[in-house]
């Protein structure tokens, strides 16, 4: 069994916040893959279903971000899971908007939700880091993550959520490379070779030049006058 945890804050007030992209990802997975209805358990909302051959539990902690580990730890102990059976999907300031990366273990990089999970289950769980970008100044971070996504973000956000959902069966199977390929097909689709873009500029054809005129034959050289004496001419005839 796999446990997928999406991080966020509960309530309509926070539903479209950047900090809640983990919740959004789980909602899309549940909808696209026919998971059961959400219900309250483990201090959060859970939904059960299958991704490929794997049984998967989706968990959205409702303890608020800074206490997410309480909910995750409770679910892990109930199902007797190892931390390596858990994948956490969360917002990532250090990735550009629309970028996604998978990571096994490691530090929490100051993310309060991850910090809480570290405290309750250790650091060996997997993560899916969903890039939201950085506001540029440390003091602006809190307001930035607790603000709704801008309208200009909607296109890339939709692509990311679709890619994560389509790749979720690979994620459940532990195949991070194929999961990332599914995401890439949505966030950076290959361009067809016969696309409608502007064709490359053609080199203009050079006008044909008329053939060079044939060289005229050299004029015949006029014979030189015979300067021999009559006697010499006679001698030369009998040589």
Swiss-Prot record:
TRNA binds at residues 14, 64, 66, 112. InterPro entries: Pept_tRNA_hydro, Pept_tRNA_hydro_CS, Pept_tRNA_hydro_sf. It holds the Pfam family Pept_tRNA_hydro. Its EC number is 3.1.1.29. Keywords: Cytoplasm, Hydrolase, RNA-binding, tRNA-binding. HAMAP family: Pept_tRNA_hydro_bact. This is Peptidyl-tRNA hydrolase. It comes from Ruegeria pomeroyi (strain ATCC 700808 / DSM 15171 / DSS-3). The record marks 9 as: Discriminates between blocked and unblocked aminoacyl-tRNA. It is found in: Cytoplasm. The record marks 91 as: Stabilizes the basic form of H active site to accept a proton.
């Amino acid at each position: 069994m796999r446990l997928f945890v999406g991080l966020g804050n509960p309530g309509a007030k926070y539903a479209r916040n950047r900090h809640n992209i983990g919740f959004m990802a789980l909602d899309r997975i549940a909808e696209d893959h026919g998971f059961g209805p959400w219900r309250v358990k483990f201090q959060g909302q859970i939904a059960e279903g299958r991704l490929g051959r794997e049984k998967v539990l989706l968990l959205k902690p409702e303890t608020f971000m800074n206490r997410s580990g309480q909910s995750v730890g409770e679910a892990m102990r109930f199902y007797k899971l190892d931390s390596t059976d858990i994948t956490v999907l969360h917002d990532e300031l250090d990735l550009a908007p629309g970028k996604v990366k998978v990571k096994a273990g490691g530090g929490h990089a100051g993310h309060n939700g991850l910090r809480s999970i570290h405290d309750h289950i250790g650091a060996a769980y997997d993560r899916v880091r969903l890039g939201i970008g950085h506001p540029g100044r440390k003091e602006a971070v809190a307001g930035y993550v607790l603000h709704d996504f801008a309208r200009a973000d909607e296109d890339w956000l939709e692509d990311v959520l679709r890619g994560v959902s389509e790749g979720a069966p690979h994620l459940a199977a532990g195949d991070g490379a194929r999961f990332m390929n599914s995401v890439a097909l949505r966030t950076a689709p290959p361009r067809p070779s016969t696309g409608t873009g502007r064709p490359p500029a053609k080199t203009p054809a050079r006008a044909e030049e008329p053939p060079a005129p044939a060289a005229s034959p050299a004029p015949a050289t006029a014979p030189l006058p015979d300067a021999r004496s009559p006697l010499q001419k006679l001698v030369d005839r009998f040589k």
